[in-house]
């Protein structure tokens, strides 16, 4: 089956959903020919993955995932693809904690660092949050504190089977866009940062019609976040509609360089995050406020980004955001 699929994609022909899904099901249930599968992933990338092919990957791995059975009308995730190569501070992770100050249930899907100095799991660990909390504590955390961190390897054991192939290839493949599409919690709202414009469009095509409202973002200076230095392209999804527009940070009086939001070690990033929650105004502060504000708009908490900025600044100024972090540290205490 893998040999036939490899021949098709090498000839630059598309596979349909069923062909890819059946292939992946057989691979995940049986033996994996790593060399052939690596060649298949590389050929698929060269050809360009279609919506149907990506959807088959999502469904095959989601079926094998350990799910968190939690239903709420205001579930949201801010997980991006990562891999933009810019080495910035953990903006989406910090934003996720700010968002949990509001009437939202933030199911933050994430992993350790792959290309940056510090991944979402790394910074949260340094903030004293148990990234491998048991499911019951996750459910209680969502219900009582509006936040849970879902450590990807814990919920997606099937990905271990292909980890060696991915590592040996050393190139971006379809797997680089799967992370945000595989949250173990059912989501109604989502903001997804993409590592390039092509990935942005592919993710939008796959997510279309699957969330109440979502946005896929990529900035002109290459970030999988809303940038504080350049315009960010947004593909906003509502129902079957995709709306394209740009966010200019200058419109909100925000103007910094990429160097101003550089990320460091997990320990240093945790320190920066505490300074943000203490209200110390900096490029980091504005990056987190702007990204949080946009997520509030997407999640229908704020009517627009401007209102979202005011809400986020107020949550930080009043101390709600710092109090939220302390509550999360207590609830998700390691060994508790």
Curated annotation (Swiss-Prot):
Reactions that this protein is recorded to catalyse: N-(5-phospho-beta-D-ribosyl)anthranilate + diphosphate = 5-phospho-alpha-D-ribose 1-diphosphate + anthranilate
Amino-acid positions noted as binding Mg(2+) 2 in the UniProt annotation, renumbered to this chain: 224-225
Binding-site positions, anthranilate 2: 166
Pathway: Amino-acid biosynthesis; L-tryptophan biosynthesis; L-tryptophan from chorismate: step 2/5
Gene Ontology BP terms: L-tryptophan biosynthetic process
GO cellular component: cytosol
UniProt binding sites for Mg(2+) 1: 92, 225
Domain of life: Bacteria
Residues holding anthranilate 1: 80, 111
Alphabetized Pfam families for the sequence: Glycos_trans_3N, Glycos_transf_3
Keywords: Amino-acid biosynthesis, Aromatic amino acid biosynthesis, Glycosyltransferase, Magnesium, Metal-binding, Transferase, Tryptophan biosynthesis
Enzyme class: transferase
E.C. no: 2.4.2.18
Cofactor binding note of this UniProt entry: Binds 2 magnesium ions per monomer.
Family: Belongs to the anthranilate phosphoribosyltransferase family.
Function: Catalyzes the transfer of the phosphoribosyl group of 5-phosphorylribose-1-pyrophosphate (PRPP) to anthranilate to yield N-(5'-phosphoribosyl)-anthranilate (PRA).
Protein name as annotated: Anthranilate phosphoribosyltransferase
Organism: Caldicellulosiruptor saccharolyticus (strain ATCC 43494 / DSM 8903 / Tp8T 6331)
